[in-house]
Each structure stands twice: as structure tokens, then as C-alpha cells.
Amino acid sequence: MARKFLYFVAFCIVLVIAGRIVYELFQEELAEIALVPSAEFSPVKPLEANAYEDSKLWYSRPGIGVKDPARWQPPLTEGAPAATPDATKAPRFAVFFVHPTSYLNRASWNAPLENGGDPEAERIARIYLRGMASPFNAASEIWAPRYRQATMGAFLTDATEGKKAIDAAYALSLIHI
């Protein structure tokens, strides 16, 4: 019985070592298999010139209120004084923040904007904004748009579809404020 157990342990060790070797040799190919969409690129309809007047296309902008993820602050620890910036010394400035790609779905090359977008990408984008845009809370205005971000796999391939997806993410999201 002990011999069978040792054979099993040896088999598991060999399997882990073989898996690690395969991963080291083929990690780029494995990332492409896992993240690059296999679907054809379908061009997205350009946004209207005034599309960003709609508050639904913004994660953060003046007037959103307490649900603004870019204005998030961690809770104060008990007994710690609240840090309040002196408004008279702080210069007025605005921050325009474009969050990194949060769309990991292989279903399409670009994240949808219609019907609230991809729920998982929206959740991740809000986390990114809390962590990356909230340090700019001293700004008088923080603007963070929703955009047709390219899927993560578009950055991992040399295929023309990937380039088209990246171009669509940034070229079609021109913002006229």
C-alpha cells in the first residue's frame, strides 16, 4: 500500500514538473489560446458626436455623487484624524482618467457599451478606478469615460483583428466635452 502511495506521489511530482516545462516553453501560445477571441472582428458603429453628454457613458464626472468610484476613499481607522485638504491652497485642476483594459471576455474583440456593457468588465473597471483614479481626489473634477475597450487578447496577438480592435477602442471614443 505504501509503495502505491509513493508511486502516486512520484507521478504527481513528474506531472507538475512536466506542466511547468510546458508552460515555460509555450506561455505566449497558451496566453493566446486563453485570451484571444477566435471570432471575426466586426466593426462597431461609431458613437454620435454628442454621445458623451449622456451620463451613462461615464464612470466618473462631476455630479455623479457618492457612487463615483474615482472619489472612493478607504474607511478611516478608529481614532485617526480625517485628512481634509485646505481648499484655499489647492489649485483647481481636472483629471481625465482612462482606465486600463478590464474586458477579458473572448466573445468579441471589443467590450459592448449598450445595455450597461459586460457586467464583469464593468465590475473590474470600477475596481481599477477605485485603486488608480482615487489618488487624484484633490482634483476639482475627475472625468473617467466608459469606452469600447479592446479585449485583453487584442494586445497579445499580431493578428489584424487585434489591431482593429485597439483602433476601434480608442479612435471611436473621441470625446467632445
Question: Which residues does each PLM region occupy?
Answer:
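Flexible, membrane-associating and regulatory peripheral segments of lipid-active enzymes
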Residues: A2-P135
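Conserved small/polar residues in nucleotide/adenosyl-binding loops
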Residues: I175-I177
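Chitinase-like catalytic core of GlcNAc-active glycosidases
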Residues: A168-L172
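Short, well-ordered beta-to-alpha junction loops that form the rim of enzyme active sites
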Residues: P100, Y147-R148
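Short acidic/His/Gly/Ser-rich catalytic and metal-binding motifs that mark active-site loops
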Residues: L104-S108, T151-L156
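Conserved alpha/beta-hydrolase
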Residues: S140-Y147
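Charged, often glycine-rich, active-site loop that binds/positions anionic groups
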Residues: G153-A165
